[in-house]
Amino acid sequence: MTNYPSIFNDVIGPVMRGPSSSHCAASLRIARICRDLMDEQIKDILIEFDPNGSLATTHKSQGSDMGLFGGFLGWEAFDERLQDSEQYLATAGINYSIKICELAEKHPNTYQITLTNDKEKRTLVAISTGGGMIEVINIDGNKVSMAGDYFETLIYCTDATSIINYLEATILFDEITFHQGVHSFIEIKSQNIIPENICNEIKQMPTVTFIKAINPVLPIMARKNLKVPFITCNEMMEYNKDKNKSLWELAVDYESIRGNISPALVMDKMKAIIQIMRNAIETGLKGTNYKDRILGSQSPQYKETFEANQLIGGDVINKTIMYVSAIMEVKSSMGVIVAAPTAGSCGGLPGVVFGTADSIHKNED
């Protein structure tokens, strides 16, 4: 199925804590899918990284471990407990081990995860594709493609024909695929979770062993026959020929159509993100503390110097520098930021936008 970028999935986000969206937020999303795959009952976890990939030497320092542990516990990427997630994992009675070994999948950001409890053992392979985005590429030896933007139902079975016939006549779905292997299952992508009464009927079928329900982890879902009003600058200008809309209005149109949500909801989501960005600026300017970073808090001193008119003139530039620094210091102290879409540059977009807007006295609307 054709997919297109979403502003909230791919650009303005994720909302998170930690040094890297492609490590912290992505690993947390992968682990939340793992949690659903195990019906939230996890006892032991084996996490494997390839020695030639990027994660073998960075999984701890860049926050992959932290994100994984939080995801296994069902947390959000902005949960205030994340920096202590390893201790919370132990308290929950979940054991883990990390192994560096050669993997079949050669993508540099590959996670191979084996999960067990008293009843079952499942294996999942996923990759972090950047900016907090992910793709699950293998479950129990079967090739799949899950981006975390659908409700996914996996029906493990020995024969699929009668089950698929029943599903096609009974439920609304976007795609049904049968993955045949040692652990065969039917994968259903849909806009909503399959109703419990239908799942109960399916469980009674003789060829069905069990069913797994996996929730979406992205803020904006995909769908069958997805359309967008434009995808290039030329298409945007053509779309706007008879509308005369400003860029922000075109962005609202795009995300509303892309996400199948109302323009009002697009605005509400963006206002919530704006508030998080503003809070990060204010928090950073008050001063932040964190033991494990090279430089301490410098934004408050910059603010004092700015307010005392001791900087070379240039209100927009000086405010932008101050705001970017404040947000980056919040990021490095494990505060909540909007990655937009990388945590390593999370101060850039809001720093410039808010620095300019505040300098020319524009409100947040």
What are these regions (language model features)?
Residues 326-333, 358, 362:
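Alpha-helix capping at helix-to-loop junctions
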Residues 2-135, 140-331:
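Generic N-terminal targeting/processing segments that precede catalytic cores or assembly contacts
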